[in-house]
Regions:
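Residue-level signal for inorganic ion chemistry
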Residues: 13, 67, 106, 167, ...
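A non-catalytic, amphipathic alpha-helix used as a structural packing/dimerization or gating element
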Residues: 18, 22, 62, 166-173, ...
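N-terminal catalytic cores of NTP/NDP-binding nucleotidyl/phosphoryl-transfer enzymes
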Residues: 1-59
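Glycine-rich, Lys/Arg-enriched anion-binding loops that position phosphate/diphosphate groups
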Residues: 129-231
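Hydrophobic/aromatic residues located in beta-strands of well-ordered beta-sheets
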Residues: 34, 106, 136-137
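Phosphate/ribose-recognition catalytic cores of enzymes acting on nucleotide-derived substrates
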Residues: 184-296
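Generic structural signal for residues in well-ordered beta-strands
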Residues: 75, 136-137, 262
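N-terminal Rossmann-like or analogous alpha/beta NTP/dinucleotide-binding catalytic cores
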Residues: 45-132
Length: 296
């Protein structure tokens, strides 16, 4: 028995994991193999469907790590191209799932649609799967507290409003940004609050709404509390555009050029414009005091 699940799985959120966990459990119960088949890049990028507005919850590497952490036996990435997008449901099932991977069972979430024929009706979808010689295995949807089915789109909307607590709850883990520390103007150092400026590894990664957040920072193999500012630094008026800068509590090491990860714990406030650097410093001290109440 080879049990598969397919999809983009952006964020590998709680709804995705219900599907993945079902595939893993079914395979183990029958001494079979579980396989997750995903795609890269995002279809909207390839098909130019509002591609300029697309933001992702996870990079390909983040997705791989989170899927494999569920106990999946094999993680497969298929290149998403225009030719690939033209495959019908039956062509995809026959050519790839059966032809390449010998899939016998396919776990399907509530909103899973297949192929260029965009089969969304559950009965019709399952009928096509059976006709191709695969057993469909349905999984009910994961419901949020608001009564809506959990989806990547929902979580993107929530994070875009700055609610990292709810976003993290639906993901099942703290939302995070990964990148390399790059040189800034070092103005923070002059007021006693040096910051690490982050250049993201995944340029399409969604950045939460502008504001100041309590974060967990991982650098040099250790974790620390931090306060992260996302925005345009209106007090400085330097016109640098959106930046992600983080002050790491009780930390004073040179980390330019190093990997850095920030996990969002809670939002403290909106970004503000202050009359002077001294006023900014006073507010940062308040932010620091508030951040210390949180645990990593």
């Amino acid at each position: 028995m080879i049990v598969a699940a397919t999809g983009f799985f952006d964020g590998v959120h709680s709804g995705h994991r219900m599907v993945i966990d079902k595939a893993v459990a079914l395979a183990k119960e029958n001494n079979g193999k579980s396989i997750i088949v995903t795609f890269w890049p995002h279809p909207r990028n390839v098909l130019q469907l509002d591609a300029d507005k697309l933001r992702l919850l996870s990079s390909l590497e983040e997705k791989r790590q989170r899927v494999l952490a569920c106990g999946v036996d094999e993680f497969v990435v298929l290149p998403f191209t225009r030719d690939f997008s033209g495959l019908t449901a039956s062509e995809f099932l026959s050519r790839y799932l059966i032809g390449r991977y010998g899939v016998t069972h396919l776990v399907l979430g509530y909103d899973h649609h297949l192929g260029s024929d965009d089969v969304r009706d559950v009965d019709q979808r399952d009928r096509i799967v059976r006709m191709c010689g695969i057993v469909p295995v349905p999984v009910s949807d994961s419901i949020s507290a608001s009564g809506r089915a959990v989806s990547s789109t929902m979580i993107r909307e929530i994070l875009s409003k700055g609610d990292v607590v709810l976003g993290g709850s639906l993901l099942g883990y703290r939302y995070a940004l990964d990148g390399v520390v790059v040189s800034g103007q070092r103005i923070g150092r002059t007021i006693g609050f040096p910051t690490a400026n982050l250049s993201l590894y995944e340029p399409l990664k969604l950045i939460p709404a502008g504001g100041v957040y309590v974060v967990c920072v991982t650098v040099l193999g250790k974790t620390h509390l931090g306060i992260c500012n996302i925005g345009t630094r209106p007090t400085l008026g330097d016109g640098r555009g959106q930046i992600v800068e983080t002050h790491i509590l009780d930390f004073d090491e040179e980390i330019y050029g190093l990997d850095l990860r920030i996990e969002f714990i809670s939002r403290l406030r909106d970004e503000q414009k202050f009359d002077s650097l001294e006023d900014l410093k006073k507010q940062l001290k308040k932010d620091l005091s508030a951040a210390r109440k949180f645990e990593i």
